[in-house]
Amino acid sequence: MLNTLWEIREKVRDLSPLVVNLTNNVVTNFTANVLLAAGASPIMSEGVEEADDLVKIANAVVINIGTLHSRQVEYFKKAVYLANKYQKPLLLDPVGLGATTYRNETTFELLNSGNFTLIRGNYGEISFLAGNSAQVKGVDSQTSDFAAENLTEVAKRYKTVVVATGPVDYVIAEGELYLNRTGDIMLQKVTGTGCALTSLIGAFVGVIDEPALAALAALAFYGAASEKARKISAGPGSFLVNFIDSLYNLTKEEFLELTTEKVQGLR
């Protein structure tokens, strides 16, 4: 399996998929740099007027609700419609879902307005989507009692691939369940690493027709790069720089070493 995951990573570098990001203004720069380092081509867009032109040429479209406002929501709705119209992979990152009524209403409105290829969130966000309405304390909620059943519920309800990231990353789709245990805790010390991960998953989904396997490849690659970076970093500042470098220069040999016995397919 690990060799297959690396082949997907190489496809990203070879094909340089165009990822249209409708993301939040906290993470725009970091997300673009993550995509570039991995070999993808990012577009960071805020103007609904260019939606049709961009979605038409995209290999994937990523919606991130991190810094939510009404003008952005208008763009989100149009992007959902256009991605479905042009049959483009469409990903949702419901940042902070469960924290405010506005985020909750917007997320459910988007999910009910079209078909999403994949939803990625942390344990708290995915649990909320599944109907467990405990208050989410922040955008980095890592609820320790997360149950994999939450993914099954969300995947069935929205007919999509669901990715929940935390101490163990879960990927579920119909007939598929994967676990990933790569990743360093330093990722939690740099803002935007989850948001950038969703966009990176978009790049991987954009090069093969198996979104669950593509998501697993992105998770394993991202986590392995973070582990490599941590080894030569003194703290969050140097880690940030070293992480971008690791995404760029991680070798197959390093990937296989860092992912062995950390990636599983359960069915």
From Swiss-Prot:
EC numbers for this chain: 2.7.1.50
Keywords in UniProt for this one? ATP-binding, Kinase, Magnesium, Metal-binding, Nucleotide-binding, Thiamine biosynthesis, Transferase
Pathway listed for it is:
Cofactor biosynthesis; thiamine diphosphate biosynthesis; 4-methyl-5-(2-phosphoethyl)-thiazole from 5-(2-hydroxyethyl)-4-methylthiazole: step 1/1
Q: Enumerate the catalysed reactions.
A: 5-(2-hydroxyethyl)-4-methylthiazole + ATP = 4-methyl-5-(2-phosphooxyethyl)-thiazole + ADP + H(+)
Q: Which residues bind substrate?
A: 44, 192
Q: Which CDD domains match?
A: THZ_kinase (cd01170)
| EC category | transferase
Any Pfam family the entry gives = HK
The biological process GO terms on file are: thiamine biosynthetic process; thiamine diphosphate biosynthetic process
What is the recorded function of this protein according to its Swiss-Prot or TrEMBL entry?
Catalyzes the phosphorylation of the hydroxyl group of 4-methyl-5-beta-hydroxyethylthiazole (THZ).
UniProt xrefs under NCBIfam families:
PRK09355.1, thiM
| Family assignment from sequence similarity | Belongs to the Thz kinase family.
Q: What is this protein called?
A: Hydroxyethylthiazole kinase
What lineage does UniProt assign to this protein's organism? Bacteria, Bacillati, Bacillota, Clostridia, Thermoanaerobacterales
